[in-house]
């Protein structure tokens, strides 16, 4: 079964409405589970969500994107802040936020000497320039093991 067929199946089962466009995988998505494109109606999904969190969570993300999709084509509020979106998302048991991916690997750990706030970073920072955002204390680098 292709991704588009899966989305069509979820749309009919959970919304009772057909999905008439295309759905595709997009490995470049980092922090979102999916995206809806109003211009042409297609949906993109993050395959890492399915790999790391399983089919149940992925189905909830498909429902989330289908809420955007169906509300847009019905002429109702399809953005996250709109009441129609929030109500439909609750009705179909969609996820409001995508779960964090475990594949995020921090290479650097910085600790504030004053308040102990920890900062994970993929790239190194210049300790002579940057300070703690909470208390403006000095940062030190801790070795990641």
From Swiss-Prot:
Give GO MF terms, alphabetically. Answer: zinc ion binding
Q: What region holds the SprT-like domain?
A: 5-140
Q: Which UniProt keywords apply?
A: Cytoplasm, Metal-binding, Zinc
InterPro entries reported for this sequence: SprT-like_domain, Uncharacterised_SprT-like
> What detail does the entry give on cofactor binding?
Binds 1 zinc ion.
Catalytic-site annotation from UniProt: 65
- Gene Ontology biological process terms in this record: response to stress
Question: Which Pfam family, any one, appears in the UniProt record?
Answer: SprT-like
Q: Where in the cell is it found?
A: Cytoplasm
Task: Give a GO cellular-component term.
Answer: cytoplasm
* Family as reported in the entry's similarity comment: Belongs to the SprT family.
Name this protein carries in UniProt: Protein SprT-like
UniProt organism field: Streptococcus equi subsp. zooepidemicus (strain MGCS10565)
